[in-house]
Amino acid sequence: SIIGKAKSSSLQEKFKSIIGDDHNIRFPGYISERKKLIDAYDSHNILILPSYTEGQPYVVDEALARRRPVLIFEDISHIIKGRKGIFVSKRDINSFSEISKYIINNYKKIQEEIGKNKFPLEKNMFKQISDIISKN
C-alpha cells in the first residue's frame, strides 16, 4: 500500500502506469483516523520510507510502535537515533534487495528487538517536542 497524500494526482497515475494493474498494490491515500491507521500498520510487515529529506517523521515511530521494521535510504539516516528496527539502504537495487531479504529472514527476531525501544508516551511527546523547540 502506498499511504499518504500525493502532491499531485498525476504522480499517482504515473506510478500506476508503471506497475500496471497489480492488485497487490493499493493507494488508500491519506489516513487520519487513528483506528484505520493502526489497522494499516498491522496489515503490513514493513514500512519503506523512500524520502530524500525528512525532519523527524512520525511515521517511523508509529511503525516501530507496532513492531514493524522500517527501511529507509541513506539520505535520511540521521533519523535512526539509536532505535532498533530501522535499516538503511543505499539507493540501489542490490542494497535494497539484500536488506529486504535480511528483514524477511529475521523478521521475528527484529520484532523482538524493536520491542526493546523506548517510545515516548503520547501525552509526553508534545511536551518533549515543545521543550526541544524552545531550546532553539
Over which residues does each language-model region extend?
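Conserved acidic donor-binding segment of nucleotide-sugar-dependent glycosyltransferases
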Residues: G85-N94, K101-Y107
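Nucleotide-activated donor-binding/catalytic signature segment of Leloir-type glycosyltransferases, i.e.
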Residues: Q12-I31
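A charged, aromatic-enriched C-terminal amphipathic alpha-helix characteristic of glycosyltransferases
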Residues: Y107-N136
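Short hydrophobic beta-strand element within catalytic cores of glycosyltransferases
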Residues: A65, P69-I72
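A short hydrophobic beta-strand element within the catalytic core of glycosyltransferases
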Residues: L47-I48
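Aromatic "clamp/platform" in nucleotide-sugar-dependent glycosyltransferases that forms part
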Residues: Y52
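Short alpha-helical segment that forms part of, or immediately flanks, the ligand-binding pocket
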Residues: I38, P57-A65, I79
